[in-house]
């Protein structure tokens, strides 16, 4: 039945014919360059078929015609253009369209990236101009700062509306009151915003300047000169010392290491902690001195800049020799920017700079992030504007459209403009600054820095947390924890027993032999008078330790010293074996941990080159082994091997170690390996199985001849080489099982548990291997012990992706582990289905992810779920992900400051994210929600009073309050108490951390929604009506004092409403209340002319004696109580009948 279901369902015969025509076209064109690699738009084999099984949730996603998936960009554009021609049905229209497209392409055209020829040490020979080698995290420059900031502000409806209102005051017929009444608040808002952006931009400028000003040694004809990183050009010869950052993409020409190779750390580029071995160009490495680089005529041909950090194609040519020397260049001859030199000193020629480097091309441009709260408030202001227009139209309608009604309509729009409060932006921006200050001053999260002060509320709305692994969840330090021999297991507390066995073994070797045959000593020792069991265990320990000390790709490097020539030299093995002088370098931290462990038990690696390695025994004897063959680790084989010959005995041994899934079929039958591997995995240990096989000289010579022939094959070289190696991998002797732990950051487990309880789904995106990522996910409790893990098997085409997605769909409540390659294939065909399924998982682990893939995953989550995302990382490879997320958090740690500098928030440890979210994020959101709604209430209530006042005066467009009263109402009279809400909190910080479930409520957005907004609108209408009608009813005899009466009651009502809203009092809140009340009382003495109806024209001024009477005071108090008391009663009843989640904790 399976082969009856087509892989690509075709809906019509026409579609099928079109598909065959495309296939014929591609066949005719030919493979073209890069045909050996599967491209993004490459056609799949349409003869494949799917198994019979139900499709997933979205049927359309699986039944689309294959033309939707397999059309090349060029073919797609051609098809679109033909459709456009047919649609317009006119040559002149098509000509106009083409001209417009050409103009758009000219205006938006980017510089085309091209391959280049780079002459060594001759930047002036470059044919084209290349970008500056500078790091830029700034959003603006000197010319775009003011326009950019103004655009970012006036794109908000609130600010644009007030700009229009303020400009309308220049029209005499529309003028209401004084100009400063409108322009002063708007100017203040813009000044605060520009100042804040200027400070943030200046800080980014300083950080960029610090990175761009790092000094490097540049090799010239006259010698070495110091040059800034930003001044490096294509063609320069740059010298990079050990532990120094590589400033630009270079081709590796020369090193101080005599082997002609060095190690670099790439964790800031790809997230992998494995050190990468780089090989210098042999032609330049053989030159006697550095200055000889200028005595030859040589150039590098490099491919055009591209995103892929794992590939490079180029050639090195020396044309002053006869015949010219040509060397092919690959990824192992390159030094990418943002990597760190781990050994020796390197010299390279710069081929890419600035935005053409791999690291920058994999980093997205910084964008202006707008918080969800700001977007929600922007929607509410649009609703308020609609209410403003409706109210103005109603007033004009009730006026009977008398006279120039359109002028009255605009005047009403201006009179009620306080429905949309301009002080909203001021209060929110000042609140954000206060939240940032509180975060940086929190002693429980020292070193935390707020770099983007506009989105602190985002910390309280997060649903997805995407985290890096290396250096973020882990300390990036491997520690040897367990050695298992099958019958006996050794842990950290019994390592001294292993050390004793090794010491006794080699001491007896040294005493029983005269250096003639040291390797046979353990066998003779095992035949001594000691018990048989003890001898067996001791012999097995000896063999296991020796295998671990030999089977690796670790190189010991000794501390550098300066030679006579001025070049860096390194201590050789026969010169200096001091332990404090030695460091280990390898492509895997696991291997370094194993070699360090063998050193701790007595067998030390002291020297290694391409042909041999030397071990030092506890007795001080040096054992030399010739390296005959080396089989490096690959993700496909999951194992590595080495064939060595003992120089003392001429014994040839094949050692191998690898993952249990790969080694279980290679080693001899045993009954303990699978069980013990499972036990160690449950402890969070990374396991490796070690085995050996002894070879005779004849066996090795036969293997070597077959292996050499396979390596010379032109076709299927990889498969043939693997087949020859597999002929040795049979019935190998199982020596031991090792367990290594990648130590987690402090308090990672409780922090992840807290985040899960808070309703945050955690995704781990790492460039590391699948096995490593899975192990860390278990040990960190990202995946709980009771949850199953679904490892998404590798897929390469649409059919395989379909099958695997259907298999994954049947799983329930299991974590997903998927590799970057499989992820890209699935996203190419079934993007929506994969994201939908992944979002249902309790945890997701994506391994082997490139920086661009990390950013793409974040973008997909934002687009498909519409939920708030947060990305956290500590390396340069995490910058794109951090910038793509709604909220980016950088950890300043061992991998440098690049992620920290590009993030919105910077912390020093992963565990700090718990308090940052549970306490500061939660408080920031709830405070801003309350502050925003209270400010809108403040504008609505005064607009309601204006509407009542106008209706009393026969719907005349006459202002109730003018001049300083309107400015003071939103500033000195009520601003301090309202702004003091930024100090309010519903529960104590300790409770918020202890009960992270409180955070989960925030993701629903109930603190600020249309429901709560409508409640505040009703409160405003009620209070505004009570204040105005109460003033008119109670003071009918003294109608001339309505302004003073109503305004006084209004101020008291606002102060009481703030007091009723506050849940936790702070001494500054009390000060704010009394300070505002004092300012109002004091202003009555010198602002009496503002409190009369119509002021001078009516001859009405405030009677100071009147406001001091008991009648005035009790009637104002009565109005205020009537406006506030019912609301307090309703609030009290609601808390009793339907208490919020935090009320029990706060009580």
Swiss-Prot record:
Keywords: ATP-binding, Golgi apparatus, Lipid transport, Magnesium, Membrane, Metal-binding, Nucleotide-binding, Translocase, Transmembrane, Transmembrane helix, Transport. It catalyses: ATP + H2O + phospholipidSide 1 = ADP + phosphate + phospholipidSide 2. Pfam families: Cation_ATPase (PF13246), E1-E2_ATPase (PF00122), Hydrolase (PF00702), PhoLip_ATPase_C (PF16212), PhoLip_ATPase_N (PF16209). Residues 166-173, 404-408, 961-962, 1034-1041, 1088-1106 are extracellular. Residues 509-520 have a biased composition (Polar residues). Mg(2+) binds at residues 468, 470, 874, 878. It is a multi-pass membrane protein. Its EC number is 7.6.2.1. The lineage of its organism: Eukaryota, Metazoa, Chordata, Craniata, Vertebrata. The keyword Cell membrane does not apply. It comes from Rattus norvegicus. It is found in: Golgi apparatus, trans-Golgi network membrane. InterPro entries: ATPase_P-typ_cyto_dom_N, ATPase_P-typ_P_site, ATPase_P-typ_TM_dom_sf, ATPase_P-typ_transduc_dom_A_sf, HAD-like_sf, HAD_sf, P-type_ATPase_IV, P-type_ATPase_N. This is Probable phospholipid-transporting ATPase IIB. ATP binds at residues 468-470, 591, 633, 638, 657, 686-687, 766-768, 848, 854, 877-878. Belongs to the cation transport ATPase (P-type) (TC 3.A.3) family. Type IV subfamily. One of its GO terms (cellular component) is endosome. It is an enzyme of class 7 (translocase). Its cofactor is Mg(2+).
